[in-house]
Amino acid sequence: MNMMLAMLINITLSLCLISLAFWLPQLNLYSEKASPYECGFDPMSSARLPFSMKFFLVGITFLLLDLEIALLLPLPWAIQSTNMITTTIVSLSLVSILALGLSYEWMNKGLEWTE
């Protein structure tokens, strides 16, 4: 009962804060705030640079695979099984899933820089 009450209070408080932030925005736009700042000089070109989508996808793929490897490293201690075969099968299945994901990215040319 205490956990349900705590969850109800947390959800209610979260919804109140989200709605408050949504309905009471600070919209004080004036010329100094809207102009780009570049060390006191007028900007020579646009401040927005084009972003490579390929670089973004390769970076996201790297982060996902890196996170999965970080979760895979403590696996033998997390399983705590005296049976070595079970630990090996679980580890190999996770590595196989990672390898399948990497091969899928590779076959769909998600890891190539040039087109």
Curated annotation (Swiss-Prot):
Belongs to the complex I subunit 3 family. It is a multi-pass membrane protein. The lineage of its organism: Eukaryota, Metazoa, Chordata, Craniata, Vertebrata. Core subunit of respiratory chain NADH dehydrogenase (Complex I) which is composed of 45 different subunits. Interacts with TMEM186. Interacts with TMEM242. It is found in: Mitochondrion inner membrane. One of its GO terms (molecular function) is NADH dehydrogenase (ubiquinone) activity. Core subunit of the mitochondrial membrane respiratory chain NADH dehydrogenase (Complex I) which catalyzes electron transfer from NADH through the respiratory chain, using ubiquinone as an electron acceptor. Essential for the catalytic activity of complex I. GO terms for biological process: mitochondrial electron transport, NADH to ubiquinone. Its EC number is 7.1.1.2. Keywords: Electron transport, Membrane, Mitochondrion, Mitochondrion inner membrane, NAD, Respiratory chain, Translocase, Transmembrane, Transmembrane helix, Transport, Ubiquinone. InterPro entries: NADH_UbQ/plastoQ_OxRdtase_su3 (IPR000440), NDAH_ubi_oxred_su3_sf (IPR038430). The chain crosses the membrane at residues 4-24, 55-75, 84-104. GO terms for cellular component: mitochondrial inner membrane; NADH dehydrogenase complex. This is NADH-ubiquinone oxidoreductase chain 3. The keyword Cytoplasm does not apply. It catalyses: a ubiquinone + NADH + 5 H(+)(in) = a ubiquinol + NAD(+) + 4 H(+)(out).
